[in-house]
């Protein structure tokens, strides 16, 4: 199994169509051969994780699928439909090397033992306890500033299944060591981990590397 991530920067005139796609395409994707997990995603700058951070003209999809069915996915009506309304497209084919936690009650990624020393992608996501959203938002800025200033970061964006309460990041790194430096040695992030444990912000969370 592999994980495929798509992001589309759409033309503004097609925003109503994109919203319709978000409402109905998950079911169409789940019916495709070889697909075991689907999430349609909104995106943002990844600076505040509040609704004002959202970018209504950039959307994404994350799909776990058997590698032999990848061509069928790329040629599906869903993916071709998004490509038609997009002015920019991005696709990454990912092989999971580690995952901790759950996503919608599932472990969605088929982890492989790989001897890999190249670039790394990371996906983090969490379901925030509803009554703790405001406290969480106040705590986020130092972490996001630290993330975007991190040595070895190639790019990072915010991702989410909903504007409030279901938040995450997709980031690309030059190496696993750069990612570990941010995650476990950066002061802002380690303080956020401690605060998460103390305040129990999340009802569910996941951290994965590819």
Feature roles, as predicted:
Residues 181, 188-204:
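Extended hydrophobic/aromatic segments used for targeting, binding, or gating
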